[in-house]
Amino acid sequence: MDRPDCDPLLLSRTYARFPVVNRLLSGWRRTYKRRIRPLLAETGHASLLDIGSGSGDVARSLARWARQDGFTLDVTAVDPDQRAYAFATHLPGDKRVTYRLAHSSELVAEGLAFDVVISNHILHHLDARQFAAVLHDSELLCTRLALHNDLQRSNVAYILFLAGFWPLGWGSYIVRDGLLSIRRSYTMAELRSAIPPAWTVESNGPWHNMLVHQHQGSGNRNRA
């Protein structure tokens, strides 16, 4: 689905089915409760940047969970792919979610800052230069916490994903792209050897690794 010439109908169905996959596998509800909600509880409000937001389902879920808990989470969801941006912006809107067609580096250039910076399932799509750039941008953009959630490569994950999600594969890229993503993804040891000292790697459930950066210091950037 990264290919510019992929079938638009299959791609649209893939975006539409991402919420099912993320709800079952990605662990963002757990991460929200453990990582993001405690920050919200301090002031009642926070800003969050979702890098490579795709269909926008994670961004919308986080804003909704915060609202249900009585907090305000203003989410900026950025993706450089026009197709993802078009899909997300044609869905029913959420006043707390803003979509932008942009790279993270553009937000750095604008001097923006967010309490929390996240991504979901993008690291395995990046080459070494892009990987380093996203982590660097995240350090510059976050004022409190950065969390990058990605698949953990394993034979068990590959087999179980194929067995459990094949119904979603019909008419979409879900299974094909999911299996390729697992093959491209990192083990925990590989991530530890690839990240700079300001980052740590944690297990996020049985199928994911999470890169974590706790911001130190302060600056005079433009709060988003």
Spans of features found by a protein language model:
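A conserved beta-strand element that flanks and buttresses the S-adenosyl-L-methionine
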Residues: 118
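Class I SAM-dependent methyltransferase Rossmann-like catalytic core
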Residues: 8-33
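Class I SAM-dependent methyltransferase SAM/SAH-binding core
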Residues: 49, 55-57, 62-106
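Hydrophobic adenine-recognition pocket in adenosine-nucleotide-binding enzymes
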Residues: 122
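C-terminal alpha-helical "lid/dimerization" subdomain adjacent to the S-adenosyl-L-methionine
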Residues: 151-194
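Conserved beta-strand signature within the Rossmann-like core of class I S-adenosyl-L-methionine
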Residues: 143-151
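A short, conserved alpha-helix within the catalytic core of class I
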Residues: 126-137
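Conserved Class I S-adenosyl-L-methionine
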Residues: 184, 188-217
